[in-house]
């Protein structure tokens, strides 16, 4: 049996690892608690880390979450395997582009650290308010309950979107 490599990581690092391996482009705009995913991917790209396709991931940091979703849509239209990372209000700003992406059957994965929607004051507690607002967009959803599930189901999301051409929201509350 081959030697297994065990690492200790949080859900953000697990999702970022899989996203990096399965993506050619990552459109990012950091928003807590999903910021570490984008930071990991940006760092690995700068270090020249190779993905499953033998290339480094092209990282585009955008001016807003809406811009990141627009960049994802454009990149997908050009034929690149693309992903993004977001949470909370950031995900809500991506909804208009999500309808376009799903309607055009463009395969992609949005990795979401599910978080409470803030109303009058900042709230960083985890819940599913943000992703439930996206139910009607046409994106399939996978939800994880542990870091191991994040690692496993992130790969499932990337493979399933390629096979089905249905975009996925890969969500978890495991960001701490």
Language-model-detected regions and their locations in the chain:
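Conserved small/polar residues in nucleotide/adenosyl-binding loops
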Residues: 174-176
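Thiamine diphosphate
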Residues: 1-133, 138, 146, 155
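Residues in well-ordered beta-strands of folded domains
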Residues: 111, 142, 171
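Flexible, glycine/charged-enriched surface loops at secondary-structure junctions
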Residues: 165-171
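Arginine/glycine-rich "motif VI" loop of SF2 helicases in the C-terminal RecA-like domain
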Residues: 103, 162-164
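Active-site/ligand-binding-proximal alpha/beta "capping" segment
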Residues: 148-154, 158-161
């Amino acid at each position: 049996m081959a030697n297994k490599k065990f690492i200790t990581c949080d859900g953000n690092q697990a999702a970022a690892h899989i996203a990096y391996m399965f993506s050619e482009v990552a459109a990012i705009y950091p928003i807590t608690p999903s910021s570490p995913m984008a930071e990991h991917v940006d760092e690995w790209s700068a270090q020249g880390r190779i993905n499953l396709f033998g290339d480094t991931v092209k990282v585009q940091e955008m001016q807003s979450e809406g811009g990141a979703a627009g960049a994802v849509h454009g990149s997908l239209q050009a034929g690149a395997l693309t992903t993004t990372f977001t949470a909370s209000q950031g995900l809500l700003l991506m909804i208009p582009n999500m309808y376009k992406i799903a309607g055009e059957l463009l395969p992609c994965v949005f990795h979401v650290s599910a978080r409470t929607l803030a109303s009058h004051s900042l709230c960083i507690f985890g819940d599913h308010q943000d992703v439930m607002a996206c139910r009607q967009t046409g994106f399939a959803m996978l939800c994880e309950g542990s870091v191991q599930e994040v690692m496993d189901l992130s790969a499932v999301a990337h493979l399933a979107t390629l096979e089905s051409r249905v975009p996925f929201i890969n969500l978890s509350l495991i960001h701490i």
